[in-house]
C-alpha cells in the first residue's frame, strides 16, 4: 500500500515539473539576463537555469510558450555578442588574403551599425547590409560605389516611422565614401502579438494549482498511511494480547 502511494507521489511530482518548457539553451549569463528582462517586460514569467559548462537555459510555463517565442523572434534574441573591430583581426592570427580581410571588416561594420540602430528609441531589431566591390583596386580598376541598406522593425505607435531621414543621415556619417542616394532604409512596424496558442486558454496560476493538488494528495496519503498503520498496529496488539491470554490459561 505504501508503495502505491509512493508511485502516485512520484507521478504527481513528475507532472508538476513538466509544466515548464525549454525555450533556449546554451546561453551565456548576459544573453540569459537579456532574454529574462524582455520576457518579464511583456508579463511572461521565465526561469533561468544554470547548467554549468553547458551554459544557461530559459524555461517558461507551457501556456506562455507561444508568446515567448514571438517576442524572441521580434527582438532577435538571444543577442549576438558585441563586435569589436580588433576582435576581427587578432594580432596572433595567420595572414589572410586582402579579400578575406575586407570581407571580415565589412561584416564587422555591418554588425556595429546594427547594434547602433538598435539603441534608437522604438527599434526592436535591425539589419544592415553593405554592398561593396571586393575587387576594388585590383589591376588598377576603379572601385564601384558602395551601397547601404538597412531594415528596422519598430514598436507599434513609435515615432520612428517619421525618422527615415535621420537613419539615413546616421548611416551616411558612419560610413565613408557613400552617396546619400545609395542608402536605402526600410521600416517595418511590429505585427500584433499572438499571446496564446489557438484554442488554448491562458492559465496563469498553473504552478500554484499544481502545488495545491500536491498538498491535497499528500494529505490524502498521510490519512491513508495513518489508517493503515492504525489497523496493522491494532491487529498486532490484539494478536499479542490473545496469545498472552492463551499462555496464561495453559499455565493455569
Swiss-Prot record:
The gene is prgK. It is a lipid-anchor. InterPro entries: AMP-bd_C_sf (IPR045851), FliF_N_dom (IPR006182), T3SS_SctJ (IPR003282), YscJ/FliF (IPR043427). PROSITE patterns: PROKAR_LIPOPROTEIN. A lipid is attached at residue 18 (N-palmitoyl cysteine). Coiled coil: none annotated. Residues 1-17 form the signal peptide. Belongs to the YscJ lipoprotein family. The chain crosses the membrane at residues 207-227. This is Lipoprotein PrgK. Pfam families: YscJ_FliF (PF01514).
Amino acid at each position: 500500500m505504501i508503495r502505491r502511494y509512493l508511485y502516485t507521489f512520484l507521478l504527481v511530482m513528475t507532472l508538476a515539473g513538466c509544466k515548464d518548457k525549454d525555450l533556449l539553451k546554451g546561453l551565456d549569463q548576459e544573453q540569459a539576463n537579456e532574454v529574462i528582462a524582455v520576457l518579464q517586460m511583456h508579463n511572461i514569467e521565465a526561469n533561468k537555469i544554470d547548467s554549468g559548462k553547458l551554459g544557461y537555459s530559459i524555461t517558461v510555463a507551457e501556456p506562455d510558450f507561444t508568446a515567448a517565442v514571438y517576442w524572441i523572434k521580434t527582438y532577435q534574441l538571444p543577442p549576438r555578442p558585441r563586435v569589436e573591430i580588433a576582435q576581427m583581426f587578432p594580432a596572433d592570427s595567420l595572414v589572410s588574403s586582402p579579400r578575406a580581410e575586407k570581407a571580415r571588416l565589412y561584416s564587422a561594420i555591418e554588425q556595429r551599425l546594427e547594434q547602433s540602430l538598435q539603441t534608437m528609441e522604438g527599434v526592436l531589431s535591425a539589419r544592415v547590409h553593405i554592398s561593396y566591390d571586393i575587387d576594388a583596386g585590383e589591376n588598377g580598376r576603379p572601385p564601384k560605389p558602395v551601397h547601404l541598406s538597412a531594415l528596422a522593425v519598430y514598436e507599434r505607435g513609435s515615432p520612428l516611422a517619421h525618422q527615415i531621414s535621420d537613419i539615413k543621415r546616421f548611416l551616411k556619417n558612419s560610413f565613408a565614401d557613400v552617396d546619400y542616394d545609395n542608402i536605402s532604409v526600410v521600416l517595418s512596424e511590429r505585427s500584433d502579438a499572438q499571446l496564446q496558442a489557438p484554442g488554448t486558454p491562458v492559465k496563469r496560476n498553473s504552478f500554484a494549482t499544481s502545488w495545491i493538488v500536491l498538498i491535497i494528495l499528500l494529505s490524502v496519503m498521510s490519512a491513508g498511511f495513518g489508517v493503515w498503520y492504525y489497523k496493522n498496529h491494532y491487529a498486532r496488539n490484539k494478536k499479542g494480547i490473545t496469545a498472552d491470554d492463551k499462555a496464561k490459561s495453559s499455565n493455569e
